[in-house]
Amino acid sequence: MGGSADPRFAGVRDAFEALGDPGNALAVPHAGEGVVDLYGGWRDAARTEPWTPGTLVHVFSVGKAVVAAGLVRLLEGRFDDPVAAYWPEFAANGKAETTVRHVLAHTAGLPAFPEQVKDPTDWHGLCAMLAAAEPEFPAGTAVAEHAMTYGHLVGELIRRVDGRMPGEYLRAEYTGFALGETDGEQARTAELEYAHPDWPAQTIGTDDYRRRVLDNPPGWLALDVLNSPTWREAQVPAVNLHTTALALARFYAALPEQEIHARGEDLLLRRHVNWGLGVQVEETGEFGMGGIGGCDAFADPAKGYAYAYVTRSLGGFDRSERLIEALEECL
């Protein structure tokens, strides 16, 4: 195990070491000071290359908060503008009144790609598919995480407003985020593995709605897809940002407190969710995003800390929950 932890947070260090994860990292800034920056294990499945501070990790939906923050920065509060004001083709099939806020808060009515995705690297084709789609529900009338479509909706708005692809825009505006990896970044990216063999099937589930939303492109959770150069260099902003725990923790530490923009029983998550602009917001003020596989990042403004945990071992959130419990005890 490498890195450091302030002596006041020795309990967090002990909890991190006790996880025994094959490759992971944890970062916590508190009251403006970096108090935890730990990493351990191996970057590769063969366990020949040790994890380093620069190891990049595929963080799945944790990246949604980053791409959303990029659009929020660009629009400077113009969230009630129609999406079609920036993306005219989007007005098709009754979407002329759909706003940027609807998109950012997962209420745009496009929670799934309407057709099978044959090429996840086809940015313009997938955006055209969404622009032409008929919404599954009128914008603003239901809450449903746009698990796979979110990045193309938000990312295309970034491209229409700024002129750059979302990956290039995020590189220019933030530090430590790789959306569409270069060869050099791929060389230091963690190799994903399953914590247990049935993880993909359990994640997708058997519910028809969940499968339609999550399993498109079909089979994308296979390790030979997720670890492939083609997937890593693609821009799929909803799910394939690569980054470090430290970059995520610093990102959250710099964000202002977040407001709730939509709330209700989320059709995908099957629980009540308060959505901000790209993040889930608790009634007590904490805000953040987790990703399938166990990566997790959030901020707690009331207690003055931010938190990010990343792992290459795809499993549940029990690891992050144990770390958060240890952190709260130290505070």
Regions found by a protein language model. Give the residues of each.
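Short amphipathic alpha-helical face segments that pack within enzyme cores
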Residues: 65-70, 149-156, 246-250
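Active-site helix/loop module of the DD-peptidase/beta-lactamase fold
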Residues: 53, 61-62, 75-111, 115, ...
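The feature captures the short pre-catalytic strand/loop hairpin that immediately precedes
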Residues: 46, 127-136, 221-232
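Extracytoplasmic/secreted proteins, especially bacterial periplasmic and envelope-associated proteins
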Residues: 11, 99-102, 125, 149, ...
